[in-house]
Amino acid sequence: QFKPDPPFISGLELAGVVLEADPESGFVPGDTVIGGNKTGAFAEIASIPAGGLSRLPSGLSYAQGAAMGAAYSTAYTGLVELCGLTPDQWVLVHGASGGVGLAAVDSAKAMGAKVIAATGINEKRDRISKLYDPDAVILAEGRFREQVAEITDGHLCDIVFDPVGGDVFDES
């Protein structure tokens, strides 16, 4: 864990407008960006290396863009860097109605995986289906292993992504 020496300004993820940029950075003043650094994101003006920035996707507010970093980088790290996700693998995502879970469903689908989204909140099943188009949405309660086996024709899952933990993970 990174522990900066005081005094320092907190904050990891940010979104904003480029005020100044090195000509070789690929950014120009006025560009809207998202990014982060180990500290300083809560400052009114932050100095961030160009490698820590990306363009703010169109249609997103600054708040949405800044929030993407934690959820999507966590999902990417788990799915790709730790589990080696490849297209056509079956991925079971627990906590699919939360921020990191939704990012994992979205990312895995974008990378060509077959995704089963599991949520403990029945009221959120339709929203997950409409917004993120997983291959299936199940309730993560009781013994859901049989549901997964039925959906995957007995294959079960190549990757279980679980930002929740506890009994649900043990069942997986």
Report the location of each language-model feature.
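Glycine-rich beta-strand-centered segment in the early N-terminal region that forms part
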Residues: Q1-G40
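NAD(P)H dinucleotide-binding glycine-rich loop of Rossmann-like/cofactor-binding domains
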Residues: K3, T32-G95, L131
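NAD(P)H cofactor-binding loop motif with strongest signal on the N-terminal glycine-rich segment
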Residues: A21, G95-A96, V164
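Terminal peptide-recognition signature
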Residues: A46, A75, A108, I128, ...
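Mid-domain Rossmann-like dinucleotide-binding core that forms the NAD(H)/NADP(H) cofactor-binding site
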Residues: A66, Y72-G142
